Amino acid sequence: MANLRKTHPLLKIANDALVDLPAPSNISVWWNFGSLLGLCLATQILTGLFLAMHYTSDISTAFSSVCHICRDVSYGWLIRNIHANGASFFFICIYMHIARGLYYGSYLYKETWNIGVVLLLLTMMTAFVGYVLPWGQMSFWGATVITNLLSAVPYVGGALVQWIWGGFSVDNATLTRFFAFHFLFPFVIAAATVLHLLFLHETGSNNPAGINSDADKISFHPYFSYKDLLGFVAMLLGLTSLALFAPNLLGDPDNFTPANPLVTPPHIKPEWYFLFAYAILRSIPNKLGGVLALLFSILVLMVVPILHTSKQRGLTFRPLTQFLFWALVADMLILTWIGGMPVEHPFIIIGQVASVIYFTIFLVLSPLAGWAEIKALQWA
């Protein structure tokens, strides 16, 4: 009699994705981040669900309801701290996952990669609307500043902003709809994740050598299920440590003050994981130009597969492009630092130079380096 997991219509799907999935034998720890993202998503949905049971999306009670969750609800403080810091870990894992994709040429699986970029955009939208919900000062002013960017859209900008707001300013209608979006988007992300996996399993995983691994595959379970489990333990250890020992480390002190439309905080800035994009936005002294640069700072990932000029897939044996990759990592860190700084000298010029370098590496230097490496191999 055949094994039930191989014959049952539902179990067969799970089996092909998690148990009998043929995986390259040489994939490293960098391939752990996909499953870690799944864990992050599950954690966020679960903690978010419990928070939603006690939260009220009304401007007169939102801030108080968050205080109530932390003070009166059983383990509410823990659920909130895990949810707030879980978002940070989510983005750490996303950026690591994307970095691995860029380093090892995983972007050549175009459908998987493009759905991944869509997933990144969805996650960023979810995090943004979620940050507005506690209705603190930075929540309110962050919502005002970022939604106002839509007014840069020619002709329909003003109407678009009022449509998003549900009025003439960020008000009760805005908070209510943002809560609705924040509840809905994680399930959209989960659905897109299924598509992401569907397309990945059409081709199979890439590997550090960047070559076809059909001749040397091993089953996902038990080898990589246990390897992923180690990653789970490491991440959950980090998350719980942060949530228990330094829950407000990554937050903004301004968000402990209830939203006040009459008082603008001295420095309006988003959470740390958006600072690189915020720095790119601020580095262009034109509203529409800044918004386009902000959008393209993420959408540039979609053109990476088109601009792949090398005959080798990954960067394992390509020292020139390796240098560019690490220059990009350093540049992202500089942009993140600048995004949190006030708009004054020397931060303005540093941000502008870093923004130019960011786009130059993606659009000019990487394709050139790939081409140069091919030439060098031909001459060798």
From Swiss-Prot:
Residues spanning the membrane: 33-53, 77-98, 113-133, 178-198, 226-246, 288-308, 320-340, 347-367
KW Coiled coil (keyword) present: no
Claim: Zinc is one of the keywords in the record: no
Listed GO CC annotations: mitochondrial inner membrane; respiratory chain complex III
Cellular localisation: Mitochondrion inner membrane
Essential cofactor(s): heme b
Pfam families in the cross-refs: Cytochrom_B_C (PF00032), Cytochrome_B (PF00033)
InterPro entries, sorted: Cyt_b/b6_C (IPR005798), Cyt_b/b6_C_sf (IPR036150), Cyt_b/b6_N (IPR005797), Cytb/b6-like_sf (IPR027387), Cytochrome_b (IPR030689), Cytochrome_b_C_euk/bac (IPR048260), Cytochrome_b_N_euk/bac (IPR048259), Di-haem_cyt_TM (IPR016174)
Record membrane topology: Multi-pass membrane protein
SUPFAM superfamilies assigned: a domain/subunit of cytochrome bc1 complex (Ubiquinol-cytochrome c reductase), Transmembrane di-heme cytochromes
Annotated positions binding heme b b562: H83, H182
UniProt binding sites for a ubiquinone: H201
GO-annotated biological processes: mitochondrial electron transport, ubiquinol to cytochrome c
PANTHER family per UniProt: CYTOCHROME B (PTHR19271:SF16)
Additional detail: Heme 1 (or BL or b562) is low-potential and absorbs at about 562 nm, and heme 2 (or BH or b566) is high-potential and absorbs at about 566 nm.
Subunit structure: The cytochrome bc1 complex contains 3 respiratory subunits (MT-CYB, CYC1 and UQCRFS1), 2 core proteins (UQCRC1 and UQCRC2) and probably 6 low-molecular weight proteins.
Role according to the record: Component of the ubiquinol-cytochrome c reductase complex (complex III or cytochrome b-c1 complex) that is part of the mitochondrial respiratory chain. The b-c1 complex mediates electron transfer from ubiquinol to cytochrome c. Contributes to the generation of a proton gradient across the mitochondrial membrane that is then used for ATP synthesis.
Protein name: Cytochrome b
Natural source organism: Oncorhynchus mykiss (Rainbow trout)
